[in-house]
Regions:
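An N-terminally biased module of ancient metal coordination in phosphate/nucleic-acid-related enzymes
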Residues: 1-88, 93-95, 195
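Charged catalytic cores and adjacent phosphate/nucleic-acid-binding surfaces used
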Residues: 1-8, 12, 23-28, 95-111, ...
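Residues that cap or flank secondary-structure elements
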Residues: 17-18, 115-116, 206
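A conditional alpha-helix N-cap/helix-loop micro-motif detector
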Residues: 19-20, 117-118, 167-168
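Structural recognition of the beta-strand scaffold that forms the well-ordered cores
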Residues: 37-40, 87-88, 136, 157, ...
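Glycine-rich tight-turn/loop motif centered on a GG-T
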Residues: 57-61, 109-114
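Helix C-cap/helix->beta junction micro-motif
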Residues: 80-82, 131, 181
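C-terminal active-site-proximal or functional interface alpha/beta core segments in diverse enzymes
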Residues: 98, 114-116, 120-123
Length: 229
């Protein structure tokens, strides 16, 4: 039985200032790499709202920031034109901390309705879950990250292709020590630039065509991550 590949961590130049590859090039790259689905997870960071930097390094209001993020997802869908399923997501950073969290399952209007990147983690997590979403701590062992209480998140990104290999090993060891083996474990390329090779994600027996299907797959753990470590 064929397995279908989904990327869970991908940035595009049209939605993340730290990414340099165009949406068009990114979509073609993932199609060529044999992926069926792609979650666009551009950054949403609280410190970028209303700063003195020029756009898009600074965005005047939260609502405009949400539109900027989701417009990039819509652009990716248009570019893919049915050749690749493009799904909603974002990578958020909340105040007073350099941790990053991958959020799946919330549409544009849901994110606009509550300033999620100004909230404390427990409040943000509660909102995400109450609205059917999933929150995963991204690259937890990267330098500058802080490990958080497991009850505030649904899962951990246990493989990130931008990490040093020992960082991916360490998170698995830490999860075992704290008894958090019931959490969702994910993998992602953390794609940003032209030289980033799509190399990670999840494998499923059926293609993931919608964000709702993605949430169902994640919550049911009906997938395998790749690469295996």
């Amino acid at each position: 039985m064929p397995l279908y590949k989904t990327e869970l961590h991908c940035h595009t130049r049209d939605g993340s200032c730290c990414a340099s590859e165009s949406t068009e090039a990114t979509i073609e790259k993932y199609i060529a790499a044999g992926y069926t689905s792609l979650v666009i997870t551009n950054h949403m960071q609280s410190y970028r709202i209303g700063s003195t930097e020029p756009f898009p390094f600074s965005i005047p209001t939260y609502e405009e920031y949400v539109d900027y993020c989701y417009d990039a997802i819509d652009l990716a869908r248009r570019v893919a034109d049915g050749r690749l399923y493009v799904l909603d997501g974002f990578e958020m950073r909340i105040p007073y901390c350099t941790n990053d969290y991958l959020v799946y399952g919330l549409d544009r209007e849901c994110v606009k309705a509550f300033n999620i990147i100004k909230a404390e983690l427990d409040t943000a997590s509660k909102y995400i879950r109450e609205n059917g979403g999933v929150i995963v701590q991204a690259h937890p062992m990267r330098f500058g990250m802080t490990l958080v209480r497991p009850e505030y998140i649904d899962g951990y990104e246990v493989h990130n292709s931008h990490n040093k290999p020992f960082m991916n090993t360490m998170i698995r060891e830490w999860i075992g020590h704290i008894g958090a083996d019931d959490k969702i474990f994910t993998a992602g390329t953390d794609h940003h630039n032209h030289d980033d090779i799509p190399s990670a994600g999840i494998l499923t027996e059926a293609p993931i065509k919608t964000t709702e299907e993605l949430i169902s797959v994640l919550k049911s753990r009906s997938f395998k991550i790749f690469p295996e470590e």
